[in-house]
UniProtKB/Swiss-Prot annotation:
Name of the protein in question: Endoribonuclease YbeY
Gene giving rise to this polypeptide: ybeY
GO MF term set: metalloendopeptidase activity; RNA endonuclease activity; zinc ion binding
Function: Single strand-specific metallo-endoribonuclease involved in late-stage 70S ribosome quality control and in maturation of the 3' terminus of the 16S rRNA.
Pfam families per UniProt: YbeY
GO biological process: rRNA processing
Natural source organism: Leptospira borgpetersenii serovar Hardjo-bovis (strain JB197)
Top-level taxonomic group: Bacteria
Amino acid sequence: MIFNCGILFRKELKDFPCELGLLLVGDSDMRKINRLRRGKDKTTDVLSFPLEFDSAPLQNVLQKRTGFDSNSLPPIALGEIVISVDTLEKQAVEIGHSVKDEFYRLLVHGFLHLLGYDHERGEEEERIMKLKEDECLEILQEL
């Protein structure tokens, strides 16, 4: 599963090497992280914490690397994705699909946040992110 996500992520990053952290936690730890990092005292399914792209969108970072051998540059540090396994399992049952499919959905959702997509910035941004999420999930199903 992780390998397939790596293939998708490299495709989205135009084969530039990247690194990201993935933390799988329970609802209790997710609630603590959400409270500390976002001021929300509740659990959630997935959180993303970007590193390099807080001030520079991904496209700007990639443009600066254009023309260079991607293997000669250090990997792009995307950030961290935190997934609550407890919530993942509950949502898989509620939605009616496999734990694997829900894991893919949450990982892709978190990854897109690391790339600068944000469904919380309005309806148009939400629509764009949903389209990209569906596109990525379709690619994963084909791998």
